[in-house]
């Protein structure tokens, strides 16, 4: 798949093309009016995007699509699969009309998905592919995320890539996205660089990443590590802290994912080489549309949003919407997160980063 241009270009798809499709209610699907309840289950509060972007964007879009009559019943699992299961079951008991779930434990949540199906409640997997009889899936192309990270790292290392010692800091093995991202990264890295250490990171914990990076530094040598493949911005934060505490005079290229504000600031300052920008706006608004369209039986519009399909360990041919991604570096901050109104220059260029911003013409 070709690399996407920018989130601003992608938003045309959400705001223009889909909105232009006429209502196509299916006579076979149960239809409801605008007075609907969308259950939203998000995984944690450590990842900044969920509370700051995903929940507010989904809530706003549901309101827009239902003339203010629809509502979102929201719960955050705070990194506890057991808590998420309890929250899921409560939403079934509350008889919400549809559930959007970003599963902490994709396999473990399958029984809850089945209970929802038995209760006649559609379930849409959000951001991570849950197992069980889900009705649809909306996320980014996670394999492409890894490819973008790996390709950017190889290009940055240039002619020294083949002899470069690289540490891989992968995500939580319980997260189905982790395997896809890792697979994409390895397609670009294997045979191009020397991967000397590989770590999985329980619950995507920055502290675990930091501890593992300290082990890698002790084993490989501070000055012998040419780059670090980090699967997310949170992990990159821990990796960079480990280098700082080890007394590194210069931090080698470190990748990331999510375009968190602190990560964008690290990119500006040069502490972090790149991050993967994924349009929260497009993912969240399309998820809200899919949920509302599913409940209201608007099959033509629903199908227009789910023209891809994916397989899970339990189901095949799941209707899916895969949102493209883009590599964010110093060179395209203005054309991505600023142009898409994710952050303002003022938010990025605080006094601490003012000089770095000026150096790259960000003002």
What feature does the model see in each segment?
Residues 12-363:
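A residue-level marker of the well-folded mature domains of exported/periplasmic proteins
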């Amino acid at each position: 798949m070709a690399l996407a241009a920018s989130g601003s270009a992608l938003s045309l798809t959400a705001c223009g093309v889909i909105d232009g499709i006429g209502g196509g209610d299916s006579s076979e699907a149960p239809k409801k009016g605008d007075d609907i309840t969308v259950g939203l289950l998000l995984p944690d509060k450590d990842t900044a995007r969920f509370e700051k972007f995903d929940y507010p964007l989904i809530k706003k879009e549901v309101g827009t699509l239902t003339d203010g009559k629809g509502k979102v019943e929201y719960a955050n699992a705070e990194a506890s699969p057991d808590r998420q299961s309890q929250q899921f079951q409560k939403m079934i008991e509350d008889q919400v009309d549809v559930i959007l779930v970003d599963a902490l434990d994709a396999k473990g949540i399958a029984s809850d998905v089945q209970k929802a199906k038995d209760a006649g409640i559609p379930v849409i997997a959000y951001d991570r592919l849950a197992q069980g009889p889900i009705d649809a899936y909306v996320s980014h192309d996670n394999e492409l995320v890894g490819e973008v990270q790996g390709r950017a790292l190889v290009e940055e290392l240039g002619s020294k890539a083949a002899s470069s010692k690289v540490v891989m800091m992968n995500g939580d093995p319980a997260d189905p996205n982790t395997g896809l991202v890792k697979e994409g990264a390895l397609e670009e890295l294997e045979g191009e660089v020397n991967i000397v250490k590989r770590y999985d990171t329980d619950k995507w914990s920055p502290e675990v990443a930091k501890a593992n990076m300290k082990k890698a530094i002790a084993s490989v040598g501070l000055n012998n590590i040419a780059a670090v493949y980090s699967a997310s911005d949170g992990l990159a934060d821990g990796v960079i802290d480990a280098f700082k505490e080890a007394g590194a005079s210069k931090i080698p290229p470190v990748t990331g994912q999510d375009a968190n504000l602190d990560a964008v600031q690290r990119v500006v300052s040069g502490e972090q080489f790149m991050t993967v920008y994924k349009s929260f706006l497009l993912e969240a608004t399309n998820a809200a549309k899919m949920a509302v369209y599913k409940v209201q039986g608007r099959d033509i519009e629903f199908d227009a949003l789910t023209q891809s399909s994916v397989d899970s360990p339990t189901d095949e041919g799941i209707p899916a919407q895969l949102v493209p991604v883009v590599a964010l570096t110093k060179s395209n901050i203005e054309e991505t997160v600023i142009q898409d109104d994710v952050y303002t220059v003022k938010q990025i260029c605080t006094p601490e980063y003012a000089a770095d911003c000026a150096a790259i013409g960000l003002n």
